[in-house]
């Protein structure tokens, strides 16, 4: 199971998606943690979202659902949409710091941000 690491440095909130064993695909709990971290960043000058272990994000962790029922899928997609809406509505600049692949919903995270900075290893 992955996690979200949140740190504040020099009035910038850094959100690290920390599930490198699955290329930082996020589950419901992680998506909710990212939403909360963005909403809690009221005093920050900016928010940076990045991924651990050489990948930015592979989107939603569909394999975590096993054999999903329609309700599980609805919750994942609804929460993912809320995550993207929260990024877009944030009154502070949200920056995607991309190192490695951004695939599927990870690409959507990048597009929802105000700015994206990518290394030469990044793919979209």
Question: What is the role of each PLM region?
Answer:
Residues 1-52, 85:
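Conserved CoA-thioester-binding segment of acyl-CoA-metabolizing enzymes
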Residues 15, 49, 61, 109-111:
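Hydrophobic/aromatic residues within transmembrane alpha-helices
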């Amino acid at each position: 199971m992955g996690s979200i690491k949140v740190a504040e440095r020099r009035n910038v909130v850094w959100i690290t998606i920390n599930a490198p064993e699955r290329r930082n695909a996020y589950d419901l709990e992680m998506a909710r943690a990212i939403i909360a971290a963005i909403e809690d960043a009221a005093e920050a000058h900016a928010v940076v979202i990045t991924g651990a272990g050489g990948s930015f994000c592979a989107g939603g962790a569909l394999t975590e659902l096993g054999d999903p029922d329609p309700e599980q899928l609805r919750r994942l997609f609804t929460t993912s949409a809320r995550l993207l809406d929260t990024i877009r509505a944030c009154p502070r600049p949200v920056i995607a710091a991309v190192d490695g692949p951004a695939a599927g919903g990870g690409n959507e995270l990048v597009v929802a941000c105000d700015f994206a900075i990518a290394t030469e290893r990044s793919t979209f």
